[in-house]
């Protein structure tokens, strides 16, 4: 492999972990940021985001010689925005150089040539941000995170006003030992980001083979949930449904057997409020501290560290989890009041998302049935008020016949079912969600459970 010679100011392609190569610029690191030990590396600031990281030299390539190659193999809106940001940066840099050259030529007339003076200018921050107020979601770990505390006045929650704190700079990982139970679509990305940001993590999964990759990345292995909890200060759980969440805590060699006074347990699974209440009671009865923190997002957002965390329960546990939430998510909300409030909020959010996805699928199939172009329908939709990355990606995947799971169809149907049940418990009608739920049940009957939620489309064409 050819030696890469780089210096401050060079444009590069940098590869970080499992993410694709991304355009960036070699810059001077902050004075208080230590260089990692071991192999030679450079501090890189990435275009199209506000991210920076130490990148090993073997993971760097000069920008211009590899530009065409990278553009061919990497796709996506965020990637293109990053490349556009590089070109805008180069254009501005060229303009500054030309202006400086013209000024120098004028000043040189009528006198002897002076020695060239080195001009040092600050980085163009707008170029790194993509020159847009609508900042694209990052493919790397964001360095600007926002932790929000939502304190609402509701019948069940008597709280004050909202507080918001921006956290800037690189993440300083907690010195607490972290445990993680469940390495599914969401959990895998979360653990990867915790490790990448320097947390000490012990993992367990029902299918032990899934732990191997994370052991290679530096995680420790726990043989049982009880062992993980006993080894760690804070243990997170992210499993598929209420039964799995209960079994993990109450079953043989379960979490409850490892709980001791002061141990923290964070339930990230999307389950019903009753399950959360039960788990909270049994954990705290052993002297443990409990927080629920379900997440809104998908496998891709989990991999990107861009989840939205909605938490409730023990506020002090929420604060202890600060660096973990920064590593795995772009925003963290704390909903005051009893444990179970975050579950209620998450079920409502997923009810809306699931119903919306079913409606989009219905629109696509109706367009086809009436002789309209589905692609034109999507193009128009994405130029209107409902335009979003979610709509664009899900619809494009449908048109391409790509139903690789980003969020399992069986899980969104489970969330709809739980939300409808929650509505029944307070005598609140949920007719839209009920109708969508029937369509998802039809899709499950067509063997779409383990496909992406967008496979609900197939319920309309069979």
UniProtKB/Swiss-Prot annotation:
Where are the stretches annotated Disordered? 91-139
Task: State the GO CC annotations.
Answer: chromatin; nucleus
Q: Residue ranges of the PWWP domain? A: 8-66
What processes does the entry annotate via GO biological process terms? transcription elongation-coupled chromatin remodeling
Q: Where in the cell is it found?
A: Nucleus; Chromosome
Ranges of Basic and acidic residues composition bias in the record: 91-111
**CDD domains in UniProt:** PWWP_GLYR1
Q: Give the multimer and partner information.
A: Homotetramere. Binds to mononucleosomes.
**Function recorded in the entry:** May have oxidoreductase activity. Regulates p38 MAP kinase activity by mediating stress activation of mapk14 and specifically regulating mapk14 signaling.
Q: What is known of its domains?
A: The A.T hook DNA-binding domain is required for the interaction with MAPK14. The PWWP domain is a H3 reader and strongly binds DNA.
Q: Which PANTHER family match?
A: CYTOKINE-LIKE NUCLEAR FACTOR N-PAC, OXIDOREDUCTASE GLYR1-RELATED
Q: Which family does it belong to?
A: Belongs to the HIBADH-related family. NP60 subfamily.
Protein name, per record:
Cytokine-like nuclear factor N-PAC
Name the source organism: Danio rerio
Which gene is transcribed and translated to give this protein?
glyr1
